[in-house]
Regions:
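Bacterial Sec-dependent N-terminal signal peptides
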Residues: 1-26
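Glycine/tyrosine- and acidic-biased, solvent-exposed loop/turn segments at the edges of beta-strands
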Residues: 19-262
Length: 262
């Protein structure tokens, strides 16, 4: 066998040995069955599902997950004990969807959500405690102006809620207690004049409700008691009109998320 043939054979042996060692160094468990070291899991189609490291069955350091069709889904940087992770989640188009922190796989602290249409356009911020909204939740228009500010307690609306037109003018101000409308309900035209003034009690209209025209003149007045108009002869149009006005007040949809990452 000449020198060239020997060299080729040695290279082949080294190459195969290297591949074998690489395969053997990933997806390993210890004698107790706990994941240790570098792990790569794949979808049935062969694409990578996740790529990361484990210490005693808990993720450690940088951990990447992918959508089935290859785009990056999330990057999580775990603490040494694997209980906390700084997360960046992505839309399938590659743009950042949200950033925040997980503690024991639950959202904790401030989370920021971004537009699926353009890079670095903040559309919402929310405070979380054990995966539940607690504190201020703010939503924004594409230009960064405030669209809505409201407070949550244990994942329920609780406290003042204000909404704005795109130019920053106040469009709605109301109040919630444990997820139910309670207290004043005030809606405004773009010119700042009141459109609806009323009161809620346990999610039901209560007391006098005043509906105004854009010029400031009164359109009609209706009295409610536990959600029912006191005047049995009330024009159905008035009640329907009031319902329609409330439905059509500015609403900002909850930001889309990239889905389950665990």
């Amino acid at each position: 066998m000449n020198f060239k043939a020997i060299t080729v054979c040695l290279l082949l042996v080294i190459s195969v040995s290297g591949l074998s060692q690489t395969d053997q160094s990933i997806n390993q468990t210890d004698k107790e069955g706990k994941k240790q070291g570098h792990w790569i899991k794949k979808y049935p189609n062969g694409n990578i599902m996740y790529d990361g490291y484990f210490v005693n069955d808990k993720p450690s350091g940088e951990f990447k997950r992918y959508y089935e069709e290859k785009p990056l889904k999330s990057v999580l940087v775990f603490s040494k004990d694997g209980t906390e992770a700084i997360a960046t989640l992505y839309y399938p188009n590659g743009l950042v969807a949200s950033t925040g922190k997980y503690v024991n796989q639950l959202k904790e602290g401030k989370w920021r959500f971004f537009s699926i249409m353009a890079n670095d356009i903040l559309i919402s911020e929310a405070e979380y405690s054990k995966d539940k909204k607690n504190g201020l939740v703010a939503k924004y228009y594409q230009d960064g102006k405030a669209a809505e500010k409201l407070f949550y307690k244990n994942d329920l609306k609780h406290g003042e809620c204000v909404k704005y037109y795109p130019d920053g003018t106040l469009t709605l101000r109301t109040n919630y207690i444990n997820g139910n409308l309670n207290g004043k309900f005030e809606a405004f035209f773009e010119n700042g004049r009141p459109e609806i003034l009323g009161q809620y009690k346990d999610n039901l209209r209560d007391g006098p409700w005043l509906i105004y025209k854009k010029d400031g003149s009164l359109k009609f007045k209706t009295e409610y008691s536990a959600g029912v108009p006191d005047n049995s002869k009330i024009d159905i149009y008035q009640s329907d009109y009031l319902d329609s006005l409330e439905r059509n007040k500015v609403r900002i949809a909850d930001p889309e998320k990239t889905g389950e990452i665990w």
